[in-house]
């Protein structure tokens, strides 16, 4: 079913992103559509918290704070619980993904042609990947395709946009980075219409603050296997 003038709920998990979070919040709120921004501070220790308090007073977005670091999945689940929009998308607080591309991501959902849209970093322009991340992502995506009979190019993308009914149909349990493969597994097990579109991507290295590691890749594989055969 097509949507007219939808409200887009943007859930932004944040952990130690003081250098970039203000820019990303302002860029999200500058997108020319109706936006509900939900920011979840996962117990940052680098001064992100006071900055978020200041920005929240100025800009009026929804802000939650964890008393202890619980992981990206826990932060997302907290944010998802507060969603009131028609469509929801995940937005990381670093500068890797561009919220200016929300209108492209939302188009197929608004027209009623898709339930879920993934923004693929491999179909669009992107900064050169670290080889280990490139190979790891390709392997995990390949295994997801085999397990769920799909043809995704980028399972681990942050940009997973979906109708709110899709989100509400899933009981998400992962606390860490396993939330990404869990969402993918449950979306495909339920038979939703999924599209991919190209996005730009400016990936960062560990010296710039990247947090995901090879251990998270192993967790992703386990999550994909787990939810293929169990709910």
Residue ranges and their predicted role:
Residues 166-170, 176-193:
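A short, conserved alpha-helix in the catalytic core of glycosyltransferases
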Residues 66, 91-93:
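Catalytic metal- and UDP-sugar-binding loop of GT-A-like glycosyltransferases, i.e.
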Residues 62, 68-82, 99-177, 202-221, ...:
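Acceptor/aglycone-binding surface of glycosyltransferases and processive sugar-polymer synthases
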Residues 41-50, 95:
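A conserved acidic beta->alpha catalytic loop
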Residues 88:
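Short aromatic/hydrophobic "clamp" motif used to bind/position activated sugar donors
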Residues 17-20, 44, 72, 98:
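Donor nucleotide-sugar binding loop of glycosyltransferases
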Residues 7-9, 36, 182:
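Cell-envelope/extracellular polymer assembly enzymes that use nucleotide-activated donors
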Residues 17-30:
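Short, well-formed alpha-helical segments that are part of the catalytic scaffolds
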């Amino acid at each position: 079913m097509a949507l007219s003038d939808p409200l887009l709920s943007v859930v932004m998990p944040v952990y130690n992103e003081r250098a970039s979070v203000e820019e990303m919040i302002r860029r999200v709120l500058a997108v020319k559509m109706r936006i509900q921004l939900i920011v979840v501070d996962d117990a940052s220790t680098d001064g992100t918290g006071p900055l978020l308090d200041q920005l929240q007073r100025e800009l009026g977005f929804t802000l939650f704070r964890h008393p202890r670091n619980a992981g990206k999945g826990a932060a997302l689940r907290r944010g998802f619980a507060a969603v009131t929009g028609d469509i929801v998308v995940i937005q990381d607080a670093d500068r890797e993904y561009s919220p200016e591309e929300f209108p492209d991501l939302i188009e197929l959902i608004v027209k009623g042609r898709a339930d879920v849209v993934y923004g693929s970093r491999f179909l669009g322009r992107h900064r050169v990947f670290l080889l280990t991340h490139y190979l790891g992502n390709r392997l995990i995506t390949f295994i997801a395709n085999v397990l769920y009979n799909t043809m995704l190019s980028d399972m681990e993308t942050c940009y997973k946009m979906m109708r709110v009914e899709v989100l509400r149909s899933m009981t998400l349990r992962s606390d860490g980075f396993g939330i990404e493969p869990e969402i993918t597994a449950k979306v495909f097990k339920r038979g939703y219409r999924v599209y991919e579109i190209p996005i730009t991507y400016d990936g960062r290295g560990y010296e710039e603050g990247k947090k995901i590691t090879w251990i998270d890749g192993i967790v992703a594989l386990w999550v994909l296997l787990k939810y293929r055969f169990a709910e």
